[in-house]
Amino acid sequence: MTTKNRQIQNFTLNFGPQHPAAHGVLRLVLEMNGEVVERAEPHIGLL
């Protein structure tokens, strides 16, 4: 397969939530392009 025929797409990564006993529970929904974060959607609050 050549690189001309390859289709590259972003992928979504769920990061968190961290430990429930930690202060300021945070969950991030990250849209990644390789190792680069294209978009980050924070979800702050309770589990």
Curated annotation (Swiss-Prot):
Its main location: mitochondrion. One of its GO terms (cellular component) is mitochondrial inner membrane. It catalyses: a ubiquinone + NADH + 5 H(+)(in) = a ubiquinol + NAD(+) + 4 H(+)(out). It is a peripheral membrane protein. It is an enzyme of class 7 (translocase). Its EC number is 7.1.1.2. Keywords: Electron transport, Membrane, Mitochondrion, Mitochondrion inner membrane, NAD, Oxidoreductase, Respiratory chain, Translocase, Transport, Ubiquinone. One of its GO terms (molecular function) is NADH dehydrogenase (ubiquinone) activity. InterPro entries: NDH1_su_D/H, NiFe-Hase_large. The keyword Nucleotide-binding does not apply. It is found in: Mitochondrion inner membrane. Gene3D superfamilies: Cytochrome-c3 Hydrogenase, chain B (1.10.645.10). The keyword Transferase does not apply. Complex I is composed of about 45 different subunits. This is a component of the iron-sulfur (IP) fragment of the enzyme. Belongs to the complex I 49 kDa subunit family. PANTHER family: NADH DEHYDROGENASE [UBIQUINONE] IRON-SULFUR PROTEIN 2, MITOCHONDRIAL, NADH-UBIQUINONE OXIDOREDUCTASE 49 KDA SUBUNIT. Core subunit of the mitochondrial membrane respiratory chain NADH dehydrogenase (Complex I) that is believed to belong to the minimal assembly required for catalysis. Complex I functions in the transfer of electrons from NADH to the respiratory chain. The immediate electron acceptor for the enzyme is believed to be ubiquinone. Component of the iron-sulfur (IP) fragment of the enzyme. This is NADH dehydrogenase [ubiquinone] iron-sulfur protein 2. It comes from Solanum tuberosum.
